[in-house]
């Protein structure tokens, strides 16, 4: 990248020697990522001391690193916008919001994973370090403003995700999931690289801002081809139809805590990438990529929720559910308005709690029974009221039942879509929401309505509920926390929407895109 070298030489000439490092790196913008990186290194060092030492010290190290990252992100909120790595990373409020969702999803995923790792014989040090590496890549991806930083962040997240998917070495399903994820992910990376090379050839720069300016006057077939390649990569990352084929198999075969992270953290990073690159670079192709996203959203909402009806595995059901949920979030992208983008950010925050709450219940049931079949949940309320209540509330929220947090998240998305005349998306969203309520309530009915004699054999042999075993207390904290936010968060939806709206209104990228879209509409 010759232009970056020229820029660096110019910076060296203008800056005093003591100012050069700050000008080149500006570490304050990436301090949250630095906290995660230090926690990852400390975890690896502690792991060298042995499994017993790691089991004792890895959890507090992870809590400290992620907690510090969240505090630093809170301090960056509404602070002056700073860039880092010669402008390749931007720490605006939009990036802060998505990075906070990812860091919190990792923290909750770790809380629900310790007992699972202990019971399955998984080395906690390596597992936590790889998960922190995936978190680091996802957080950097949220603020990446250069094709090089986008690709490096994307690959950091992807490679760590492949390792996590296949971490259960003795489980054939886990190895199969990792292989499928690796093959499809490698193809997606190659497609993105080809699209990036076309963008670089058209603009002569790797900066997303410079590419966006160049494409304003270069709406050629080659530019349209690069849009297709980039959009395919984004669709793969958010598991949108028809780029979803990897999702059910990977979700079913991977360790459940890994699935919990992939369903939220990886998806949030994918939507952050979509905002940065589609909205930032392809403003001249606004109508084209929105049309493609409309098709993807309709297909995702329809196929994801309809196919989920036939699933017998809880993890596969939530895999198809996550495909449908991605379709709902895409409504906000297609709108391209302040309300649409804000509803998108809000729904990702809501999805964090209701989905991870559901996975916490699934992990707890799996730890106690070793089963993932939906039919084995029959009559569960008799033996474990906490799992029954928690899973019921989280599933109702995912279905959009009032007054749960998920209901208000969907309402904001549908209102934004209707105001922007996206009637097809709103109607399809409403219909598929009803479909999703059916399979969510089917699980709840099975847990609650069954008579004692109709309980599954698994539930009849259900072990005594004990929270004193190692790793169970963090799991209970995560479960109760997620369920509480899911149940009570609907009351606080207005402050949450204001938080999401601030992330959008203070983003120069989104405000410029909204202004250009409005101008084209008036023209």
UniProtKB/Swiss-Prot annotation:
Keywords linked to the UniProt accession: Membrane, NAD, NADP, Plastoquinone, Quinone, Thylakoid, Translocase, Transmembrane, Transmembrane helix, Transport
GO biological process: ATP synthesis coupled electron transport; photosynthesis, light reaction
One annotated GO molecular function: NADH dehydrogenase (ubiquinone) activity
Principal EC category: translocase
InterPro entries (UniProt xref): NADH-Q_OxRdtase_suN/2, ND/Mrp_TM
Pfam family membership, one: Proton_antipo_M
Membrane topology per record: Multi-pass membrane protein
Catalytic activity: a plastoquinone + NADH + (n+1) H(+)(in) = a plastoquinol + NAD(+) + n H(+)(out); a plastoquinone + NADPH + (n+1) H(+)(in) = a plastoquinol + NADP(+) + n H(+)(out)
Major location category of this protein: membrane
Subunit structure: NDH-1 can be composed of about 15 different subunits; different subcomplexes with different compositions have been identified which probably have different functions.
UniProt similarity note: Belongs to the complex I subunit 2 family.
Function in brief: NDH-1 shuttles electrons from an unknown electron donor, via FMN and iron-sulfur (Fe-S) centers, to quinones in the respiratory and/or the photosynthetic chain. The immediate electron acceptor for the enzyme in this species is believed to be plastoquinone. Couples the redox reaction to proton translocation, and thus conserves the redox energy in a proton gradient. Cyanobacterial NDH-1 also plays a role in inorganic carbon-concentration.
Protein name per the record: NAD(P)H-quinone oxidoreductase subunit 2
Native source organism of the sequence: Parasynechococcus marenigrum (strain WH8102)
């Amino acid at each position: 990248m010759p232009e970056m070298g020229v820029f660096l030489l110019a910076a060296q000439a203008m800056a005093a020697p003591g100012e050069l490092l700050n000008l080149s790196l500006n570490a304050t913008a990436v301090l949250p990522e630095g906290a995660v990186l230090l926690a990852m290194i400390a975890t690896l060092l502690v792991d060298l001391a042995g499994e017993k030492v790691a089991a004792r010290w890895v959890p507090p190290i992870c809590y400290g690193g992620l907690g510090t990252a969240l505090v630093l992100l809170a301090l960056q909120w509404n602070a002056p916008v700073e860039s880092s790595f010669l402008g390749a990373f931007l720490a605006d409020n939009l990036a802060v919001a998505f990075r906070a969702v990812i860091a919190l999803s990792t923290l909750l995923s770790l809380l629900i994973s310790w007992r699972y790792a202990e019971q399955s014989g998984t080395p906690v040090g390596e597992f936590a370090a790889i998960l922190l590496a995936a978190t680091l890549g996802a957080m950097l991806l949220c603020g990446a403003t250069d094709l090089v930083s986008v690709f490096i962040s994307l690959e950091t997240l992807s490679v760590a995700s492949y390792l996590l998917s296949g971490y259960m070495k003795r489980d054939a399903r886990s190895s199969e999931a990792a292989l499928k994820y690796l093959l499809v992910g490698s193809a997606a990376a190659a497609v993105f690289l080809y699209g990036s090379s076309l963008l670089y050839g058209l603009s002569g720069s790797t900066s997303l801002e410079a590419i966006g300016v160049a494409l304003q006057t270069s709406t050629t077939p080659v530019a349209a081809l690069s849009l297709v390649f980039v959009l395919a990569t984004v669709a793969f990352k958010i598991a949108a139809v028809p780029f979803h084929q990897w999702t059910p198999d990977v979700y079913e075969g991977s360790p459940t805590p890994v699935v919990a992270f992939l369903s939220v953290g990886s998806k949030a990073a994918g939507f952050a990438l979509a905002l940065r690159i589609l909205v930032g670079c392809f403003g001249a192709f606004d109508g084209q990529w929105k049309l493609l996203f409309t098709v993807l959203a309709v297909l995702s909402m329809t196929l994801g929720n309809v196919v989920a009806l036939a699933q017998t595995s809880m993890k596969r059901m939530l895999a198809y559910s996550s495909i449908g949920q991605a379709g709902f979030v895409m409504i906000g992208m297609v709108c391209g308005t302040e309300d649409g983008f804000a509803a998108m950010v809000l729904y990702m925050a809501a999805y964090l709690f209701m989905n991870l709450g559901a996975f916490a219940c699934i992990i707890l049931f799996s730890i106690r029974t070793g089963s993932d079949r939906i039919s084995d949940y029959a009559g569960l309320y008799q033996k474990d009221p906490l799992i029954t209540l928690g899973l019921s509330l989280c599933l109702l929220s995912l279905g959009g039942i009032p007054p749960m947090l998920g209901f208000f998240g969907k309402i904001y998305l549908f209102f934004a879509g209707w105001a922007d005349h996206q009637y097809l998306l709103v109607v399809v969203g409403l219909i598929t929401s009803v479909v999703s309520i059916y399979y969510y309530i089917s699980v709840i009915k099975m847990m609650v309505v069954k008579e004692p004699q109709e309980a599954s054999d698994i539930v009849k042999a259900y072990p005594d509920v004990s929270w004193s075993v190692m790793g169970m207390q963090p799991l209970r904290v995560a479960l109760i926390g997620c369920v509480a936010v899911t149940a009570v968060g609907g009351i606080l939806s207005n402050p949450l929407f204001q938080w999401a709206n601030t992330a959008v209104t203070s983003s120069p990228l989104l405000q410029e895109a909204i202004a250009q879209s409005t101008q084209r509409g008036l023209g």
